[in-house]
Every structure is written in C-alpha cells, then in structure tokens.
Curated annotation (Swiss-Prot):
Biological pathway: Amine and polyamine metabolism; carnitine metabolism
Superkingdom of the source species: Bacteria
One of the record's GO molecular function terms: acid-thiol ligase activity
Family of the protein in this entry: Belongs to the ATP-dependent AMP-binding enzyme family.
Cross-referenced SUPFAM superfamilies: Acetyl-CoA synthetase-like
Protein's name in the database: Crotonobetaine/carnitine--CoA ligase
Functional description taken from the UniProt entry: Catalyzes the transfer of CoA to carnitine, generating the initial carnitinyl-CoA needed for the CaiB reaction cycle. Also has activity toward crotonobetaine and gamma-butyrobetaine.
Amino acid sequence: MDVIGRQHLRQMWDDLAEVYDKKTALIFESAQGKVRQFSYSELNEEINRAANLFHACGIKKGDHVALHLDNCPEFFFCWFGLAKIGAVMVPINARFMYEESAWIINHCQAHFVVTSDNFSPIYQPMLHDKHSPLTQLFLITENCLPTEQGVVDFLSEKAKHPVTLNHHTPLSVDDTAEILFTSGTTSQPKGVVITHYNLRFAGYYSSWQNALREDDIYLTVMPAFHIDCQCTASLPAFSVGATFVLLEKYSARAFWKQILKYQATVTECIPMMMRTLMAQPVSPDEKQHKLREVMFYLNLADEEKDAFIERFNVRLLTSYGMTETIVGLIGDRPGDKRRWPSIGRPGFCYQAQIRDKQNQQVPNGVVGEICVKGEPGKTLFKEYYNRPDATEKALEPDGWLHTGDYGYQDDEGFFYFVDRSCNMIKRGGENVSCIEIENIIASHPKIQDVAVIGVPDDIRDEAIKAFVVLVDGETLSEEAFFAFCEQNMAKFKVPSAVEFKQGLPRNCSGKVIKKHLQ
C-alpha cells in the first residue's frame, strides 16, 4: 500500500508552501530567549536557498553531508535543502567530540560538513588531514570569516541565492534521504539508512497517532539530530500544516513557562524531564495550559507517572519505537483506551509478535523478544549503511525486525516492555530486569537518578551494581540504601554494590550510556 502517494520531500515542501503559505510553520527560541519565526512559504524559501547553495558548491545527488549543529532553524534549511537536490543528510550528535565525529565522517565518507562556531574546532583539523574525506566546511557564524580554503560562510553565501529552486534533480521516494547513526549506548553506532518514503510516512503516521490538526502547536526540546525530533515531532507537525515550536536547550525552570507562553497543544517529555519538572517549585498557573497530549517514553515508574499527571493535569500518550522503526509503531491509538504500563498496540502498516530464542512466537503472557513487521525502506529503515552483516542479523527478508527488546503481550493484544536484552542481568538462574530495579530505587524520595548494571560474579553469573545520584542537599548511607532495597524487592534482585555519583552519562534521548559505567 502506497501511503504517501509517491510524494518525495521536495514535492512535500512545495505543496506545503502553496497550501499554507503565510501560516506559521516554525518558531525557534534560543537558549538566550531570542525568537525566530518562519511561515510555510518563508521556510520553503530558506530551504530553496540552502539547496541552491549546496548545488552551487558541487554537492550532487547521493553525496553525504554531515550536520553537526545544536537545535536551530538552519538544521531544517539544510535537512530539506539537501533532500531537494537528492543529497543525503548525516546528522551528528551535538555532544560528540573529535574522535566520535571523525569516526562517522570516515565511516560514511562525508566530504561536506555543516556546523557552527561551537563545533568548528572539531572539523578544522580534518580539513587539513589528508586521510580524512572532508573537503568542505559550511560554517554558520555571525562573525566575519577570514578567507580560508575549504570554508564557506553559510549565512552570507546562502543569502546570495534565489528563493526558488534552481536545479530539479530527478527524485524517487525510494532514494536515501538520511543516514542516522544510532546512539551506541552499548556498542559502536550503526548508520540507519532512511528514505524519502520513510520520512514522509513518519509525518503521516505520527500525526495520526497524535490526532494532529493544522491548528495544533507542537513544542519540543528534543535534539534535531535525533529520530524523535524529526519523525515524532517536526514532520508530523509540518505534514498537517501545524506550528512546530523548537527550543534550543532544555531548562527545567523554563520549560513549563514555555509551554504556557506558546500555548502548546502537544509536547513530549522523556523521564529525565519529568523528574526535573517535578522537582521545581509549584506554580499557581502550571495547570493553565492548552496541552491535550504529552508524549512520553520508557522508563517511568507508575508512581512517577501518576504524580506527574496529578500535578500538571495532563494526559500522557506512550509509544514504543527505535531509530530502525522510524516511528513509535507500538503505542496508544487515537480514541483507544490507555493501559499503562502497557506500551500499547501496533498501529497501521505494522505487526508485532513476541518470539523466543528459536524465533518462534510464544503464548500470551510469556516474556520474549519484541519483533515487529513493516516494509523496509518504507515503514522500517532500509538497511544499516555498509553493514550487510548487521542488517541480515536484525532484519528478516519478509520484513520482520528483531528489536533486541524483551516484552510480552496480553490476551487483548496490548504489549508490555520489560527491558533491553542487553539490560537483563543473569543472576543465579534468574533473569533480572535492570529497569524493574531502577524503577523501585527511583521511588526513594532522596534519589534523583539511578542506573543498574550487571558485573561478573564467580558464584551467581552476575552481581547487581547500582549507581545512584541523590537529590541536591540530601544524604543517604549505604546501609539505608540496602535496607530500602531489601524492603521493596525480592532478595535476588537486591544490588550487591552501590556507588554514589554526581551524575550519570546520558545520550541525547536521555538513555544512560551504560558502557561508561563499571
């Protein structure tokens, strides 16, 4: 079934500009509070200018162009400008340093990078490294640039180009539009190949999931280089002609005020955001919002969810997905009952099953791997870039994707997430979920954040170690910590060791990078 009508991203933006014209498409607020705003026609013009600049600089269909940027409007100018000429965007995590960024540049052979003053020191050495594929740097800067070979002043050069597209490269919805590298919390990142069809479908699917309308205002602070901001927030908002509000940085003190300021009707919160928002002083007007949906994601304890709903008077919508699924393919459906801790049911164009280690479907109620079915290159990712081995391992020929996540299904077709397979601890013959233990520990009033890992144990396969961050100003002894655990969980789940830390290493989507914990 062709859901998108063979419409690639260039056609999408030309149509949106014609249909919605002067309606506000994008509002951006910087960390300093500076606001920039673009209508649909203005945004399309900026996209065309960027496309013309890239084409004039020799970028052609199929070329890989890396974007290393914080949240900013220019990310969207470049993303869709590259798509309009058939080039491939490679977004780089804004937290990455030289080694991580260089690995991606080399792995995907990106000859071009768009970046800002903040990150240009990462790429200047690559320009002069004969072993690096990088040949040109587009620098977004307000400063006057000295003449330097290989460096282009993006803003001033873009302004010289017309607002109509100069070059119409033949495009197909099956063309690659993006290579998005996974977060690599447990291993080296893999490049997820995403097509024009994938991105157009994401807009339709996620707008259906949120029942978005053109009068909606969707606000997010998720990073633009992440699949969530792209496919769960911006594309669905644009696809229905809604207004998309992008914040540069998350501030627990400012976020709810921004919800009120922009009269947001839809937003999203990861657990870290919810916990820090709950730690803020109560404001008398915090319930005077216009939110009808708050998208939220694992991992959140029942008590935390209920407390957040009660305090802010909001309705939470959960969904489950990963970069490879493009969208939250399992989730709460529009008009459907919500049954937390269930992660919901599959949406249209998808199937889901729970399978055992022999790849056989298991009965309802039995924990196994969550496997999902879609169409590669359309409703699922196309492949891993230059990794046919990894693609074959994860993706079956008939479209079944092995997620590596454990869960189960009930008799009414609702799915429940248990944990990542790599997040299960084998302890004395028992399989122990890190998330289950983390949720219990997180319910302690003095604990702000927690992560649990398995460490080698000569007797019981693995021992359990907890890393704990306390609420500012609080103290907690090891004895009190273990006593709390013993009172609230089975003995075999009680951690053998605890380490108190000032903070936990997290990636852009809030997931703890457990390979950095020992």
